[in-house]
Amino acid sequence: MRQGKVFIESTFAGIISETPSGFTFKYSNDYLHQENAMPISLTLPLQEEPFHNKTLFSFFDGLIPEGWLLNIAERNWKINRRDRMGLLLTCCKDCIGNVSVEPIEQEER
């Protein structure tokens, strides 16, 4: 199972996971209890229960580069363009906007 830490600005907001049945996103309890907590997307409102989807959530898929940037990522990191979680974890550490995703290494789990 591959996972990534999701940050808003530099604040840890939650975890996105790839599971055998699809994808899960869950806000961290610490983030949910912050006074100024905001959802990462209107499609992923603040809630304690995890979100589940068979495909990568549209919001996260939208963070992945397109066009020539996707071609460069595919060539440089040898990632198949259909491996959306692999692209998200590799390419979205420093995105345009205030949301970023950092991979969780095996040892961190």
Task: Please place each PLM-identified region on the residue numbering.
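Phosphate/dinucleotide-binding and metal-coordinating scaffold of catalytic cores
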Residues: 1-109
